[in-house]
């Protein structure tokens, strides 16, 4: 995950343009649509729900009921739009903090609590050839210098947060947008035509140009006003849309699709519990699975059955390896037992 985030956030121009499109439109469709696929768990049995949430139906419903009381700040047994928005802000902040901490843990190789330019370069260079690293080195340096607010040559956790979310810093936001335009706006008229987009559009992993049909589909996604051009405002609207942030809750979609436009009362919430369980309201189930990670007092973190199985397999493999190592050691010991004066 760390490498993907770095590539999306620190590479510039077409790479950012492409990866953001993939995240919003194809890679995580379920994360921007609350009622797709298995989001509705109400038709599943105990074992199926446990596979998804690590809890059987009654256990999941109990946590979802407790969640209602956390969101219902005034304890009137009804969740208002304002309370949903407050909950959404809390989720976004918690998810963002966890993301920043994870990035820090991966990149901060000397574990001093800061990220140096060398550490950032090393992390960025993983799995990239020298030519790609050199190509993006200047852009990486620019970003480092912009977010290094106290100019001490290293990034604190708050400064890394700016690097991960350019929307939080106007100078970095402007840099991202200008680089997208610089790459795609061939004739430098301040907007991107379809022909320019096709000419400069390529697959980020192979460098192969996309076919015209796919390029048109991608272009139309950004061309919000359908005037045949992508301008700066449209880039901002899509690339920096708060609705696409991790933890963002589409309040209207939740109210209409799950609660059918009705007031979100305590009884209705519990009635819809298994439809709520893996939507944006719960960070797609993570709040129910891992409440301690969100500092929520609704239960202990679970271990999903699949993760437990993998852990057992790893333990078995480790045990096998230990036995093999022991056998090899015994063989070696038999081949040459040291004399007393060699010890």
Swiss-Prot record:
Binding site for Ca(2+) 2: 108, 110, 112, 119
Listed GO MF terms: calcium ion binding
Region of interest (Disordered), residue spans: 313-343
Annotated localization: Endoplasmic reticulum
Source species, domain of life: Eukaryota
Residue numbers binding Ca(2+) 3: 148, 150, 152, 154, 159
UniProt key word Cell membrane: no
Sites where the protein binds Ca(2+) 4: 185, 187, 189, 191, 196
Binding residue positions for Ca(2+) 1: 72, 74, 76, 78, 83
Positions annotated to bind Ca(2+) 5: 223, 225, 227, 234
Residue ranges of every copy of the EF-hand domain listed in the record: 59-94, 95-130, 135-170, 172-207, 210-245
Keyword Endoplasmic reticulum found: yes
Keywords: Calcium, Endoplasmic reticulum, Signal
Protein name from the UniProt record: Endoplasmic reticulum-resident calcium binding protein
Lineage: Eukaryota, Sar, Alveolata, Apicomplexa, Aconoidasida
Gene name linked to the record: ERC
